[in-house]
Amino acid sequence: MLLDESKFDLQLKLWALRIPSQLCKVASRILNGYLLDKPRVKPITEDPTCETNRYIILSERIKNPDLSDIPEDKRDELKVLCKIEVVPYSLTLGYSYWSADHVLKQILPDGVEVPSSFETITFSLCHIAHLNITGELLPYKDVIAKVIYDKNYPRIKTVVNKVGTITNEFRVPKFEILVGKDDMVTEVKQYRATFKLDYSLVYWNSRLEHEHMRLVSQFRPGQIICDMFSGVGPFAIPAAQKGCLVYANDLNPDSIRYLKINAKINKVDDNIWAYNMDARKFISQLMEVPVHEILPEPDVPVLKATEECSIQANVQTESQNGGLTVEAIGVHSDDSSNMDGIEGSCTVADDTVAAVKKHSGSCEEENGTYDNATVSVVGRRKDRMNKRMRGSESSSNIKPWEHVDHVIMNLPASAIQFLDAFRGLIQRKYWKGSLPWIHCYCFIRANETNEMIISEAETALNASIQEPILHRVRDVAPNKAMFCLSFRLSEEACFKEDATKSLLDSSGDL
C-alpha cells in the first residue's frame, strides 16, 4: 500500500490583519480568543509584501472582512491602535502537519484499530520504534512504519516489527526493519543511568523503568545484591549507583558484554561482578565455600601442608574440567596479598572459584582459554576503592557465601522454576545475618490465582513461604499480568541440613 501525501492537504480560507510589527503584541492581546488556534501554527506571521509589517491570522470563526464577528469594543480598541487593514489569507495544512494518529485513521479501513503509542508502539528507545504488528494490521505494516518514521524523525531513525514469538534461549525477539537505517545499537536513559545496547541481540523493555526503580529503592548502600537474570543491567546499574555490591549474571554473552560497557559508562564498574553462565550454576557457585575458607571439623585434624596441596590440586583439576571459569579484567592491587600464604608452597586452591569469591589478583588474565561459562570482574582499578560505596567492608572482603541481602530473578516466563536452586544452597555455619529477600518475577493469567503462584513457588523451593508479597507490575495482555513475588528465604529451604530433612520428610509422606 502506497502513501499519497497530497490526499492529506487541507486548504483553509482565512482573514488576517496587516499591522506594523511593533504593534503585534498589543493587537494580539486585544484579539485574544479570536486568533487562529491550531497546534504548531503561529497566528502571527510575516507579511510577504512588507518587511516592517506582520499578518495576524484570525480564527476560522471570523467569516466577514468587516470583522463584524468580533465584539464592537474590541474593534474600537483596534481602530485606536492603528489603521486596520483586513486581507485574505490562505493556509494549507499538509501531510507534515497531521499527527501519526490522524494519518493512520485516514488510511486504515473502518473497524481496524489504530495502533497507539501505549499498546503497540514503543518510542522510549533512543532512535528505534518497536512495532508489534499482527493480524489484520499486517498488510499495512509498511505504511504504518513510514508514518511513524515520518512523524518522529530525527528522534526515530529505525522502525522495526517483531516477527513471530520468542523461541530462543536468550528471550530476544526477532525483528524485521521496515524503514530507516539498519542500526539496532542505541542508548537508553533511565533516571540517572545510561544503557547502551544492541536491540537485536539483547532483551530490553523500557516500560519496566518504574519497576526497576521501585525495587532498587528497597536496597541500602553497602548491601549485597545478586541478579540472576541481569540482562544489560537495568537493576544492577542503579543498584550499584546506590552503593550496593552487585553480582550480576546472564546466560546471554551479549547481555554481559553490554552490562560491562554500561558499568563503565555509569562509573560503577568497581561495584559489579559480571557472570555469563546458567542461573542455577551461577547461584550454586556463588554460594559455594572455597576450599581455603572451609572450617575444619572439631574432631578432624588440620591437614598438613602437603595434604592440603594435594587436595587443592585435585579441586583445580576438577574446575578445569567444567567448573566455574574466570575472566578477570584487573583487580584492586591490595587483593593479591590475601593469597600470599597459600601461593608460597602450592598451587592456589580452587583457583577458578576462589578468585571470584575473593576477587584476588591471582585470577587469570583476560583473553585466556575458557571451556565453560565466564565471570568478569568489571574494571577493578589499582589503588582505587569506589567512592560511592558506603558499606563498611571493602569489595575485596565480601564473601557471598556468608551473606547476600537481595536476590533478583527477572525472568517472568520461568523464574519460579529456578527457585529449586535455593534448596540446601547455604551452609548454616558460614552464614551471617538474616537470610536474603527473593524477588521473583512471574506472569499470572486471568484463570490463575495468587495462591496458585505462591504454591508453585513453594513446590519449587520444597518449603513454605512466610508472608509473601505480590506486587502487580503491569498488564502485558488483556488476560495476563506481570507480578513480582517477594519473600524472605526460609531456613527450611536454603540451609543444607534443614533442606535435606525437609526433602526426607516430604519423601516419607508419599
Curated annotation (Swiss-Prot):
Record-listed S-adenosyl-L-methionine binding positions: H212, D250, L251, D278, A279, N410
Single GO term (MF): tRNA (guanine(37)-N1)-methyltransferase activity
PANTHER family, A to Z: TRNA (GUANINE(37)-N1)-METHYLTRANSFERASE, TRNA METHYLTRANSFERASE
Top enzyme class: transferase
HAMAP family with a match to the protein in the record: TRM5
EC number(s) per entry: 2.1.1.228
Swiss-Prot/TrEMBL catalytic activity: guanosine(37) in tRNA + S-adenosyl-L-methionine = N(1)-methylguanosine(37) in tRNA + S-adenosyl-L-homocysteine + H(+)
Subunit structure: Monomer.
Keyword S-adenosyl-L-methionine: yes
Pfam families in the cross-refs: TRM5-TYW2_MTfase, TYW2_N_2
Function: Specifically methylates the N1 position of guanosine-37 in various cytoplasmic and mitochondrial tRNAs. Methylation is not dependent on the nature of the nucleoside 5' of the target nucleoside. This is the first step in the biosynthesis of wybutosine (yW), a modified base adjacent to the anticodon of tRNAs and required for accurate decoding.
GO biological process: tRNA N1-guanine methylation
Similarity comment: Belongs to the class I-like SAM-binding methyltransferase superfamily. TRM5/TYW2 family.
Native species: Vitis vinifera (Grape)
Protein name: tRNA (guanine(37)-N(1))-methyltransferase 2
Keyword annotations from UniProtKB, A to Z: Cytoplasm, Methyltransferase, Mitochondrion, Nucleus, S-adenosyl-L-methionine, Transferase, tRNA processing
PROSITE patterns for this protein: SAM_MT_TRM5_TYW2
InterPro entries (alphabetical): MeTrfase_TRM5/TYW2 (IPR030382), SAM-dependent_MTases_sf (IPR029063), TRM5-TYW2-like_MTfase (IPR056743), TRM5/TYW2-like_N (IPR056744), tRNA_Gua_MeTrfase_euk (IPR025792)
